[in-house]
Amino acid sequence: MQEKSKPVDNLRADAEKIITRAIAAVLPDAAVERALKGKTFLGRVYLVAAGKAAWQMAHAARACLQDNFCGGVVVTKYGHVNGEIANVACFEGGHPVPDENSLRGTDAALALTEDLTESDTVVFLLSGGGSALFEKPLLPLAELQDVTNQLLAAGADIVEINTIRKRLSAVKGGRFARHCAPAQVFAVVLSDILGDPLDMIASGPAYPDSSSCAQALDIAKRYGLHLSERAWALLAQETPKTLTNVETQITGSVRELCAAAAAACEALGYEPMILTDCLCCEAREAGSMLASIARTHARDGKNLAFLMGGETVVHLREKGLGGRNQEIALSAALGIEGLSNALVFSVGSDGTDGPTDAAGGIADGETAQLMRQKGVDAVQSLNDNDAYHALGAVGGLLKTGATGTNVNDVTVLLLRTAE
């Protein structure tokens, strides 16, 4: 007689299906195909792709762009070119700090898009990492690298870093779109920043800049940046505030990731509820919050799914191993212990979570007890920021491998009706 599966087994099987379907919906090739489906462009068509997902996006776009295609350029991270693309030159450069090869690729893109007419179109594909990879500095490269390193070392956030970068570049802050004018620019964006601020994704090469020179100067002074007179003068200059030749479409973001995960939940018989797609709290707090929701609704008699998208933070207290998604799962494990019909998983869409080979973590009502049986102190592991080893001891690590996309993270609480 075949042994009846336990509720946690069903929950884990569902979690695997949800993860697979959610990530598939935001892969670069699928995102580009959605954006270009049914689009027609008059005149000559050029392709420029920049970012960590640039090769995949360009590969998909090239299959869609047949008529009047005149050439393209890809600038992506080292190791991210996966073969030749017909009539497209591919460059690999430095990330998170630009190098000479980043500049060579950008120079090729600028040369390709020079002297265009108003009947021409530049299909511009943008993804995370574009700030470093798509660069034409208005300063010597070594000086720009030093400014970037100063900002990173000072703990500046991505918005602050990009506010500075825009003013030190000939392509950021809308300047690439202005370079392409009078040609039309059709920008397809794979967003890796919460809220999808188009002027901040890859420092907005094809979008009007909403930041001001006053803000840039304030950031530089607040972090005590050591800058040349030329750099200070550039920070005091304004960037383009209006662009009339650009159409932009966000085709992959944490919103799409959450929506796809919710659709997968619904297909599996759950009632999904997206709590937020801008999650940005402490990771362990997110885990505790979902555990509280689980205890509130565990006996509702319904199959429920609560979803959150975004990017939590981890304040390192000790030198353990883990990542924000693993820490969410470990925190949740403590809160849902004993609930036979509850499971929490959290996964990074890029397939990596912190400095580990895991994409995230998964925990159910038995996880904390299993840890004790294995001699693992879950509370101490959480305090030591050592979620990787704690979850790894009980099969709680999610490993997808590199996915080729990056649209933040998705966290899901599943509750099944007791069977």
Residue ranges, per PLM feature:
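Short beta-strand segments
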Residues: 48-50, 73-76, 123-128, 187-193, ...
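Internal gly/pro-rich beta-alpha loop/helix module
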Residues: 140-226, 235
